[in-house]
């Protein structure tokens, strides 16, 4: 899934992921720092439990951690953002401790810079935006990465992702900004007034456009990233491709061809007019009845999981010559 790459086409997202990479290198580069992270996390979870913020239960007391910097799989981006927000006070404490540790003096300039970034509205805003976008497309990305792809469920998840992006764009800004503001207020992070001029954090204002914070954060970043994600989804999964993939799913051999649908297979054939004449399409309807009976009765076709398995088995049994 290339949604992270698409998001990185936005300058603020490039800046954000570069800073995340720096954070992972600082916090996760040594066993000593990992030990510090576990200690601070334990203290904060216990404090939260005593305050009733968290509910104790299955999995909630399991230790969370940040993925290694070299873990570049798509899912690691989402996990990183989730844990970074969930563990924000812990990570902040670790950064402050490292910034005061004389044994880390050589790293102080880098650490002190990261503390400033971590306390900036720009960073928190981008983190929450990535949390929402990666979260709303997480199930789709996981589905598309599985070897035994469920095409019908994948297409349903594509439609849901497209719909969610549209909802975020049309009526999600106010609630999103409120959530970011609440988070910032909780941790003492200054929230800029949206009508004031935008001043980029840690970047030269010389290259910044003359615009308000609202123009930048809402129009350029929030809507800009959502539009890029929506365009990528529309490009990869337009109506024709969606119909084609849905029709292909009708030949999925899983569970004794439970998804078989002769009408969808017929529609699939119509996508290839050079290969199927009108007389071929007429014969196809009758041939499909024979095909599905044959597949369900032959033990050699039991236990197949996907179209690749079916194609291999058809060649092995020379059925590809029968149903040509």
Language model: regions and residue ranges:
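Alpha-helical structural modules in large enzymes and assemblies
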Residues: 1-324
């Amino acid at each position: 899934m290339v949604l992270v790459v698409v998001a990185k086409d936005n300058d603020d997202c490039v800046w954000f992921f570069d800073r995340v990479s720096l954070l992972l290198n600082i916090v996760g580069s040594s066993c000593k720092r990992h030990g510090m992270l576990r200690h601070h996390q334990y203290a904060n979870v216990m404090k939260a439990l005593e305050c009733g913020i968290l509910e104790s239960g299955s999995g909630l007391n399991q230790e969370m951690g940040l993925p290694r910097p070299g873990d570049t799989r798509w899912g690691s981006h989402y996990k990183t953002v989730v844990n970074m927000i969930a563990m924000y006070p812990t990570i902040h404490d670790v950064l402050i401790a490292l910034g005061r540790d004389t044994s880390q003096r050589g790293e102080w300039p880098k650490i002190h810079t990261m503390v400033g970034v971590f306390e900036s509205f720009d960073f928190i805003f981008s983190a929450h935006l990535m949390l929402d976008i990666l979260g709303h497309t997480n199930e789709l990305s996981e589905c598309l990465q599985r070897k035994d792809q469920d095409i019908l469920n994948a297409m349903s998840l594509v439609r849901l992702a497209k719909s969610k992006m549209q909802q975020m764009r049309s009526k999600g800004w106010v609630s999103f900004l409120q959530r970011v503001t609440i988070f910032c207020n909780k941790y003492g992070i200054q929230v800029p007034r949206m009508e004031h001029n935008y001043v980029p954090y840690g970047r030269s204002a010389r290259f910044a456009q003359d615009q308000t914070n609202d123009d930048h954060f809402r129009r350029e970043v929030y809507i800009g990233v959502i539009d890029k994600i929506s365009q990528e989804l529309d490009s990869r999964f337009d109506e024709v491709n969606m119909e084609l993939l849905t029709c292909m799913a009708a030949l999925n051999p899983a569970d004794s061809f439970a998804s078989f649908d002769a009408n969808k297979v017929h529609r699939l054939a119509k996508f290839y007019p050079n290969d199927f004449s009108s007389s071929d399409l007429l014969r196809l309807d009758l041939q499909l009845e024979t095909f599905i009976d044959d597949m369900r009765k032959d033990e050699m076709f039991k236990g197949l999981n996907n179209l690749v398995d079916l194609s291999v088995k058809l060649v092995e049994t020379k059925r590809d010559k029968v149903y040509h």
